[in-house]
């Protein structure tokens, strides 16, 4: 299946197909002329797929080098970025060459940032290997790295030339790594796609059920992301809906120490906490918090953060990218499949941190 991201200045396709990673070279050859390519990945993904993708690209006429770094959210920083820059220089990459981001969200965010800033921008594509990356972070052109202050605090908007999604690679993920991606899938059902929510309701929550329906879950999620990105590429309006659960979720990730709590886990806890307080305030429908909680628990996602410290979380919230002046654009769900923006002051935001 192909999904067109029809952004006027940079349209591209998402290709979703079981086994398509084996044809990575042919796919890229349709996008780029033969040239130098650097595959950016982490050490874990490299051990599974780097050689396979490298050979496929070489067979298609590309000159390929591989840069891998130690896996983990804690490596998504400017120190790693500098190492990639140095590698690109040593390989002699010019503005006519490109980067292949092969990995999960950490790899995709970092490689995209490098591509968008090296020589003021070179071409890149995404080959996501985690569920979170396949349904969310590889699509839409947000790149970035973390700082000690906040997640993704330094970043750019830069669209890839294409996204290649192979659902079969999810079978090599650990249980926790697969399940955390369901945090984003559940979010899509809540903010835009009641049909997806209905499917999630039917599934029993097992790893087997996720893998069996992975292609459908990915397609639904990508269609929601496509709609939001095409209508609002730069995150000023409808695309903000994608941040449901992320305001508190990002704060949890930052205060826990990057890599301690996985992104989808933090999103799940963020959705539950925001919904609980918003429902108490009459801003979200009665009973929706219970529905979200039960859905997250069914798939094995955490719903409560054990190291809850209001002051630390609040400090992290003050660096949220949805903040404008003293106002934060909070995303709420007005009804199943429909989201709204609810502006609150930073002071009011403290209410949403009360357990």
UniProtKB/Swiss-Prot annotation:
Binding site for NAD(+): 71-76, 105-109, 129-130, 142, 151
Subcellular location: Cytoplasm
Binding locations of Zn(2+): 184, 246, 263
GO biological process per UniProt: amino acid biosynthetic process; aromatic amino acid family biosynthetic process; chorismate biosynthetic process
Record's signal peptide: none
Cofactor note: Binds 1 divalent metal cation per subunit. Can use either Co(2+) or Zn(2+).
Reactions catalysed: 7-phospho-2-dehydro-3-deoxy-D-arabino-heptonate = 3-dehydroquinate + phosphate
Protein name, per record: 3-dehydroquinate synthase
């Amino acid at each position: 299946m192909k999904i067109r991201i029809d952004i006027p200045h940079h349209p591209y396709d998402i290709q979703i197909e079981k086994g398509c990673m084996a044809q990575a070279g042919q796919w890229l050859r349709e996008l780029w002329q033969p040239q130098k390519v650097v595959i950016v990945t982490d050490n874990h993904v490299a051990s599974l797929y780097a050689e396979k993708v490298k050979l496929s690209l070489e067979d298609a006429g590309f000159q390929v080098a591989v840069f891998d770094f130690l896996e983990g959210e804690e490596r998504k920083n400017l120190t790693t970025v500098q190492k990639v820059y140095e590698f690109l220089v040593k390989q002699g990459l010019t503005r006519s060459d490109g980067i292949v981001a092969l990995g999960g969200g950490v790899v995709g965010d970092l490689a995209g940032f490098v591509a968008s800033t090296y020589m003021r921008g070179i071409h890149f594509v995404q080959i996501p290997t985690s569920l979170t990356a396949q349904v969310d972070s590889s699509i839409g052109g947000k790149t970035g790295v973390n700082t000690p202050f906040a997640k993704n605090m330094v970043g750019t908007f830069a669209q890839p030339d294409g996204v290649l999604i192979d659902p079969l690679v999810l079978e090599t993920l650990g249980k926790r790594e697969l399940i955390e991606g369901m945090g984003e899938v559940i979010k899509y059902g809540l903010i835009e796609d009641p049909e997806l929510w209905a499917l999630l309701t039917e599934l029993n929550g097992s790893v087997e059920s996720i893998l069996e329906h992975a292609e459908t879950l990915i397609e639904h999620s990508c269609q929601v992301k496509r709609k939001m990105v095409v209508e609002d590429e730069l995150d000023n309006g409808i695309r903000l809906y994608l941040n449901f659960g992320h305001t508190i979720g990002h704060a949890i990730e930052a205060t826990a120490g990057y890599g301690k709590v996985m992104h989808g886990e933090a999103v799940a806890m963020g959705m539950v906490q925001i919904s609980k307080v918003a429902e108490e305030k009459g801003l979200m429908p009665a009973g929706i918090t219970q529905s979200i909680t039960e859905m997250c628990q069914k798939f094995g996602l955490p719903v409560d953060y054990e190291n809850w410290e209001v002051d630390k979380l609040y400090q992290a919230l003050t660096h949220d990218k949805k903040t404008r002046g003293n106002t934060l654009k909070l995303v709420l769900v007005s009804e199943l499949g429909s989201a709204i923006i609810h502006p609150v002051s930073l002071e009011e935001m403290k209410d949403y941190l009360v357990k």
